[in-house]
């Protein structure tokens, strides 16, 4: 019996699930299939045109993320229109089916894992310093500091503002 986090991290790495579209798909799809009986059939999750994964959408994604305390918008379309979503969905179905043959999949654990990956995605977004010549250097830096404060509020216990200030001081020395 393999640790669920190890399984999920392996699947994540093998399928490059680190960006908005793939993360949107897997967290919503996990919610979509948690009450289904195994084995899952990928054909059951395709739209009638076979071009998109059925059941995905921005509103649904927002609701799931909110339940996990995530208020930022990951994706307006919820991964529904992302290129590669269909292929990833099929791989995810195969992954879940294989896992289920070995042990019962705990979808609460799986969904929590993907929610944490979404948090990680937001934590890793770069800060943007604009060089707006109509503003003073101080005003431009204030915008950067506000980004750091906002990120710090979204991730309690972190010190983004202090880190940004340390980097600016070190860059000036």
Feature names for model-found ranges:
Residues 2-156:
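Interfaces and regulatory segments of ATP-dependent nucleotide/adenylate/phosphodiester-chemistry enzymes
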């Amino acid at each position: 019996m393999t640790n669920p986090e190890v399984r999920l991290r392996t699947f994540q790495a093998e399928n490059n699930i680190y960006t908005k579209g793939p993360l949107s798909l897997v967290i919503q799809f996990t919610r979509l299939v948690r009450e289904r009986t195994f084995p899952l059939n990928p054909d059951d999750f395709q739209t009638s045109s076979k071009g998109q994964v059925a059941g995905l959408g921005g509103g649904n994604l927002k609701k799931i993320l909110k339940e996990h305390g995530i208020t930022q918008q990951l994706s307006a379309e919820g991964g529904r229109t992302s290129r590669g979503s269909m292929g990833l969905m099929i791989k995810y179905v195969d992954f879940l089916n294989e896992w289920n043959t070995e042990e019962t999949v705990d979808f609460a654990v799986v969904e929590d894992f993907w929610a944490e990956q979404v948090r990680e995605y937001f934590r890793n977004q770069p800060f943007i310093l604009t060089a707006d010549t109509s503003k003073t250097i101080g005003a431009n830096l204030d915008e950067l500091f506000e980004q750091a404060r906002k990120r710090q509020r979204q991730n309690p216990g972190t010190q983004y503002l202090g880190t940004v200030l340390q980097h600016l001081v070190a860059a000036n020395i």
